[in-house]
C-alpha cells in the first residue's frame, strides 16, 4: 500500500508547490511510482509538470464534487514514474460545495481510495489556507511535510498549524503524523537562519531535515517551462538539494 504525504503550510510563498513538484519528480526518478495530487486551485503543480490546464478533461474538482472516477482524471506525465491528478480554478468553488456534504472532511480520502494501492507515493499539494480542501488532504494523508522559509514571519502560524493537525488527528485521521520540516529558500548569508531553526526545533523536535533548499533563480524559472527542476537544470544546486532531500526522506521510510 502506498504512502500519502501532504505538503502543507497555510502561509503562502514558502516554496510549497515547488517542493511538491520537485519531490514528486525526484521520487519518480528514483523508481517510485508517484502520483502528484493538485489540490490548489491555482493549479501550479499541474502546469509545473507540463500539463496544459486548458486541455484538462477532468480535475480534482470533478473527483471531489462531481463523482468522476479518479482513474479517469489522472494524467500520466512525460516524466519517469510520475502521474498527476490536475487542478484548475474550478476547485476554488469546492469549499462551498463540500460544506453541504455530510462527509465533507473525507471526500478526498474516499476519492483516492481506488488508486492508493497503485502508487508507492501520493504527494498532495495543499492550498495555502486552513480550509476544507486542506482538511481533506490531511484527512487523506499518512503524514505531512511542512516547507518553511527561514525568516521571522515564517514562524507565524506554526502554533495554528499544530492545532489543526491535532484537530484532524482527534476527529478525522488518528494516524496522521508530521513527517518533517523542510527549510526552503535558504540563504546562508542571513544571520536569522539559526534563530529560526532553533525555534522550529522547539515546535517540532528532531523533525527538521538536514537538507536545505537554497534560494535560486532556476527554481523560479522551471515552472514556466513545465519542467521540474531536476529535468530543467539537473546540475543546479536546487536540483541536487531536492535529490538529497528525497534520499533523506526515503532513508526514514
Regions found by a protein language model. Give the residues of each.
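P-loop NTP-binding core
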Residues: 1-253
Amino acid at each position: 500500500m502506498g504512502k500519502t504525504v501532504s505538503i502543507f503550510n497555510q502561509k503562502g510563498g514558502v516554496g510549497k508547490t515547488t517542493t511538491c513538484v520537485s519531490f514528486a519528480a525526484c521520487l519518480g526518478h528514483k523508481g517510485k511510482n508517484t502520483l502528484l495530487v493538485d489540490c490548489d486551485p491555482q493549479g501550479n503543480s499541474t502546469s509545473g509538470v507540463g500539463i496544459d490546464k486548458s486541455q484538462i478533461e477532468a480535475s480534482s474538482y470533478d473527483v471531489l464534487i462531481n463523482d468522476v472516477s479518479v482513474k479517469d482524471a489522472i494524467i500520466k506525465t512525460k516524466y519517469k514514474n510520475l502521474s498527476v491528478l490536475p487542478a484548475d480554478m474550478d476547485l476554488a468553488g469546492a469549499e462551498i460545495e463540500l460544506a453541504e456534504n455530510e462527509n465533507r472532511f473525507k471526500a478526498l480520502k474516499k476519492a483516492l481510495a481506488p488508486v492508493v494501492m497503485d502508487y508507492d507515493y501520493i504527494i498532495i499539494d495543499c492550498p495555502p489556507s486552513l480550509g476544507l480542501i486542506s482538511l481533506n488532504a490531511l484527512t487523506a494523508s499518512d503524514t505531512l511535510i511542512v516547507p518553511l522559509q527561514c525568516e521571522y514571519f515564517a514562524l507565524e502560524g506554526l502554533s495554528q498549524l499544530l492545532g489543526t493537525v491535532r484537530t484532524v488527528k482527534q476527529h478525522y485521521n488518528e494516524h496522521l503524523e508530521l513527517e518533517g520540516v523542510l527549510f526552503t529558500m535558504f540563504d546562508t548569508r542571513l544571520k536569522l537562519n539559526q534563530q529560526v531553526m532553533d525555534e522550529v526545533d522547539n515546535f517540532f523536535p528532531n523533525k527538521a531535515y538536514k537538507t536545505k533548499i537554497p534560494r535560486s533563480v532556476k527554481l523560479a524559472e522551471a515552472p514556466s517551462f513545465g519542467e521540474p527542476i531536476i529535468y530543467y537544470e539537473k546540475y543546479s544546486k536546487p536540483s541536487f538539494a531536492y535529490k538529497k532531500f528525497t534520499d533523506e526522506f526515503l532513508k526514514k521510510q
